[in-house]
Swiss-Prot record:
Gene: LARGE2
A GO term for molecular function: metal ion binding
Chain coiled-coil ranges: none
Pfam families linked to this entry: Glyco_transf_49 (PF13896), Glyco_transf_8 (PF01501)
Family: In the C-terminal section; belongs to the glycosyltransferase 49 family. In the N-terminal section; belongs to the glycosyltransferase 8 family.
E.C. code: 2.4.-.-, 2.4.2.-, 2.4.1.-
Glycan attachment points: 105, 131, 217, 255
Organism whose genome encodes this protein: Gallus gallus
Protein name stated in the entry: Xylosyl- and glucuronyltransferase LARGE2s
Catalytically driven reaction(s): 3-O-[beta-D-GlcA-(1->3)-beta-D-Xyl-(1->4)-Rib-ol-P-Rib-ol-P-3-beta-D-GalNAc-(1->3)-beta-D-GlcNAc-(1->4)-(O-6-P-alpha-D-Man)]-Thr-[protein] + UDP-alpha-D-xylose = 3-O-[alpha-D-Xyl-(1->3)-beta-D-GlcA-(1->4)-beta-D-Xyl-(1->4)-Rib-ol-P-Rib-ol-P-3-beta-D-GalNAc-(1->3)-beta-D-GlcNAc-(1->4)-(O-6-P-alpha-D-Man)]-Thr-[protein] + UDP + H(+); 3-O-{(1->[3)-alpha-D-Xyl-(1->3)-beta-D-GlcA-(1->](n)-4)-beta-D-Xyl-(1->4)-Rib-ol-P-Rib-ol-P-3-beta-D-GalNAc-(1->3)-beta-D-GlcNAc-(1->4)-O-6-P-alpha-D-Man}-L-Thr-[protein] + UDP-alpha-D-glucuronate = 3-O-{beta-D-GlcA-(1->[3)-alpha-D-Xyl-(1->3)-beta-D-GlcA-(1->](n)-4)-beta-D-Xyl-(1->4)-Rib-ol-P-Rib-ol-P-3-beta-D-GalNAc-(1->3)-beta-D-GlcNAc-(1->4)-O-6-P-alpha-D-Man}-L-Thr-[protein] + UDP + H(+); 3-O-{beta-D-GlcA-(1->[3)-alpha-D-Xyl-(1->3)-beta-D-GlcA-(1->](n)-4)-beta-D-Xyl-(1->4)-Rib-ol-P-Rib-ol-P-3-beta-D-GalNAc-(1->3)-beta-D-GlcNAc-(1->4)-O-6-P-alpha-D-Man}-L-Thr-[protein] + UDP-alpha-D-xylose = 3-O-{(1->[3)-alpha-D-Xyl-(1->3)-beta-D-GlcA-(1->](n+1)-4)-beta-D-Xyl-(1->4)-Rib-ol-P-Rib-ol-P-3-beta-D-GalNAc-(1->3)-beta-D-GlcNAc-(1->4)-O-6-P-alpha-D-Man}-L-Thr-[protein] + UDP + H(+)
Spans annotated as Xylosyltransferase activity: 121-396
Amino acid sequence: MLCSWRVKLKLLLATITLAVLLSWLYLFVGSLEYGRFLLLPPCLGEQPSRDVEREALASQVRRVEEENQQLRMQLGQVQAEGSDGNPQWAASAEDGPPLGGERNNRTACPEQRMVRKCELLHVAIVCAGHNASRDVVTLVKSILFHRKNPLHFHFITDSVAHQILQTLFQSWMVPSIHVSFYNADDLKPEVSWIPNKHYSGIYGLMKLTLTKALPSNLSKVIVLDTDITFATDIAELWAVFGKFSEKQVIGLVENQSDWYLGNLWKNHKPWPALGRGFNTGVILLLLDRLRRLGWEQMWRLTAERELMSMLSTSLADQDIFNAVIKQNPALVYRLPCFWNVQLSDHTRSELCYTEVSDLKVIHWNSPKKLRVKNKHVEFFRNLYLTFLEYDGNLLRRELFGCASLPSPPSDQLQQALEELDEDDPCYDFRRQHLTQHRVHLFFLQYEFLALPNPTDVTLVAQLSMDRLQMLEAICKHWAGPISLALYMSDAEAQQFLRYAQASEVLSARRNVAYHIVYKEGQFYPINLLRNVALANTQTPYVFLTDIDFLPMYGLYDYLRNSIQQLELPHRKAALIVPAFETLHYRLTFPKSKAELLSMLDMGSLYTFRYHVWPKGHAPTDYAKWRTATVPYRVAWQPDFEPYVVVRRDCPKYDQRFVGFGWNKVSHIMELDAQEYELLVLPNAFMIHMPHAPSFDISKFRLSAGYRGCLQTLREEFHQDLSRKYGAAALKYLTAERNL
């Protein structure tokens, strides 16, 4: 071995000497072309233009310096190999420095294989539950922000995350993004036998099964934890696959804490690992090679052997990956540590970077997440918050020069937008109707399990940020399940999250579903919001209300009893809850119908909108309601818009109506067209609380164009209703003309 090294060294020295001689001859010949010998004093030769001479000489010197630099680099690599006889452990630029060594690990490394333009990059993520589904959105945003290539995300999910992420990506409609889902329940038998103390539970072991879970024709994939933030183009990480040797199959960053050294506390006994071990928050997997090696059998045998003494894993899949690598060190490619800057309590991650430009990937691998202790944590937190609150609509940009695969929903939307007439006075209304809003279902933990109760009912409402203060009051008045659609920006959604987590009332409830519909466009998409909240209920019946109303105490139980007594499962009926209002922000809420009637007589309460829009609720017949003891039937009348309890499969709200006006009227009209009975409940009531006028109602009142467009939409709705229900819908058109 020593002899071989000396031969290589002599060969390189001879090469360098020859290169210097050739360079000298090259300069000599070149100088003759300019009419003088460069090694002679200037006065002895002919002197053409000094500028031309200086430029030619500088060019030749630069070439020689570049050649010498390349030769020195090759010599350094040979010396590094000869120092211990093992090129895998040489301190080359592509392996990155060890934590205790040189701190500068910028990417001034030997030339690496570049990712082809439009090459499809594959990313696998294990995601389960409501919280992880929320975290993964920030990861995806950071990837999309920097990316220049098409991406294919492979999500291993439970049923909750599947529903959330599938809806999110379908509504996001980002070009050149492909998404596949794999059922984690199918993979649980593969790892359920492994005891795991990590907070991630059984899902923290799922990455071991990727060779089986992912398609057999997928040869390589980047695997990420959900608590990752990218600060660079993920294609740079994908390019590292080109550096793997023939034996290397897994790319990992060294663990940046002393966990696997076993010196964190007394009697600490970690799983076996190579040196400091490796962190599995960022993994490069060559799946085809792993399958040929028999990866499944390899990790199983290792886990079984180690569990005999360790009894359980502490860091989930990471312990098993490290145990396998301990037995097979040739399998691992050491990624530079800036590809996984770990921010847990015991890490030494500051050794991985000296400047911002050194950062590639940040890993919040502590249960404390953003509250972790690190001297640069404020900088990292700000970088994370940038993507947390970043407007995801801005990421719907095309990749120039890369053809997207056909997407029927996207193509249909584009065609509909192209058919709009920009000179139409109502163009903005029609454009808003076609707007595709991002939707994040079940933004917070939701654990309501619908029992087989045929009379159960969910309160359904929608709101924006300015009505957030109503949530606690509604939760105090309504004990049953609630489905809410919230219209917010990305930043507002995070404000809401902090508000809900800090509220004792809201954080104590697990049967309230919050669905975020992200802002886009100039009008409030009120009926879209209602449809989102309605579509994601789990009970047979729904109470369709607005966020400004407080239901009477005990209304939830009263409605369930009424549904049963009226045998609603066997008839098509809508139960009307009479609406009242107060002008007082502080109200002693009536505990019974008798108290409400007393307050009504005293002028503390009023029938809803009696002085502004009496037609909206007059058909409820409040005079009859005062003395009624049993439900009574009322007939539909023009502009009637009561709040009702109906079956969950009722007609959807017409989404052409945005902003203010006719959004509930059109819905009640369609219920009547489908021959729903309208039954007023005698002992139910709700009270509207005062608030400042919305922006949309102000536009309605001030803009003649707004009101004109609303009238146009009403006429078009009547025409569509007539086509849908035939002669039965003519009465609505007649009633409209008689107004």
